[in-house]
């Protein structure tokens, strides 16, 4: 049995995608705890970007060390891949988080969550343009509508406003970067080691964020043990989740994997409630989970039907 056979299994892929979104969901409360522990104010953009940069840079180094140990040699990025992987790190890590951290200061958390969720829908709708095997179907469109309804349900109907337009535009730019990152990642993963791809894109993206954070005057107290432990966990989350996610994108249609991202705000809400004492026992949470689950099922249902007929 080949090592990648389990990654090609649709049931494993669904379980792994849910696991990734669960890990990313833990980032919500841990980032809040990290800001509190390091005493990072809402207006301290430089330190926030530095915090993110160190998180992703450390994650990239973790993945690189794992790669070297597993291959029993130092991994070196081929010259012909340097610009491509740098573009992935710039898009999926650096620009996405810069737009997010700047934009969130000019809009509401509700708008941020709703607009960010559009990354999954943009990927589903655009994937057929870049990948012939990733067809747009009625079920996928229905799945997107159900998923978006679920995001609306958990966040309420605050709506967009001219007062938050600047922030909303920046968050949408972040969303485009996230969707673009998924497309680029899938294209680059073909014929390449997804672990190597993840390691270098996180290192490039994290390093750029770190430099920008320092230039903007960001500072962190590295003697703060609790803060560093939180930062370490966030790095582990990024290292594990991005590595698995990139591998899944290599072997499965982008639309069928990225739709699982809609679970991130659900896990984030539940875990924030458990860890930070926020109220999670709301009807909206249950309705949102049901709608998003139905949306994910709708997007993936064709694949399962084909598996039963032995065609996939």
What residue spans do the PLM features occupy?
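Helix-helix packing/entry segments at the starts of transmembrane helices
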Residues: 19, 54, 93, 97, ...
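Hydrophobic/small/kink-forming positions within alpha-helical transmembrane segments
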Residues: 25, 29, 57, 89-94, ...
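Hydrophobic/aromatic residues within transmembrane alpha-helices
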Residues: 34, 51, 103, 129-132, ...
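Hydrophobic transmembrane alpha-helices of multi-pass small-molecule transport proteins
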Residues: 63, 125-126, 136-156, 209, ...
């Amino acid at each position: 049995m080949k090592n990648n056979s389990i990654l090609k299994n649709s049931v494993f892929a669904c379980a792994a995608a849910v696991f990734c979104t669960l890990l990313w969901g833990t980032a919500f409360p841990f980032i809040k705890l990290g800001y509190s522990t390091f005493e990072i104010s809402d207006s301290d953009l430089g330190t926030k970007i530095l915090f993110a940069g160190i998180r992703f840079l450390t994650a990239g180094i973790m993945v690189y060390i794992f790669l070297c140990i597993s291959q029993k040699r130092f991994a070196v990025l081929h010259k012909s891949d340097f610009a491509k992987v740098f573009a992935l790190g710039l898009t999926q890590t650096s620009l996405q988080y810069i737009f997010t951290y700047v934009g969130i200061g000019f809009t509401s958390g509700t708008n941020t969550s709703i607009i960010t969720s559009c990354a999954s829908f943009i990927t589903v709708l655009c994937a057929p343009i870049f990948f012939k095997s990733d067809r747009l179907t009625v079920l996928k469109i229905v799945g997107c509508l159900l998923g978006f309804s679920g995001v609306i349900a958990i966040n309420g109907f605050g709506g967009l406003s001219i007062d938050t337009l600047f922030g909303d535009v920046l968050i949408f730019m972040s969303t485009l970067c996230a969707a673009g990152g998924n497309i680029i990642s899938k294209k680059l993963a073909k014929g390449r080691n997804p672990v190597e791809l993840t390691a270098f894109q996180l290192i490039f993206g994290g390093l750029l964020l770190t430099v920008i954070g320092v230039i903007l005057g960001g500072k962190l107290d590295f003697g703060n043990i609790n803060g560093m432990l939180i930062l370490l966990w966030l790095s582990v989350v990024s290292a594990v989740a991005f590595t698995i996610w990139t591998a899944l994108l290599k072997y499965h249609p982008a639309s069928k994997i990225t739709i699982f991202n809609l679970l991130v705000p659900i896990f984030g809400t539940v875990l924030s409630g458990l860890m930070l004492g926020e109220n999670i026992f709301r009807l909206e949470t249950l309705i949102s989970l049901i709608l998003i689950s139905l949306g994910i099922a709708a997007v993936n249902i064709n694949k399962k039907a084909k598996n039963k007929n032995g065609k996939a």
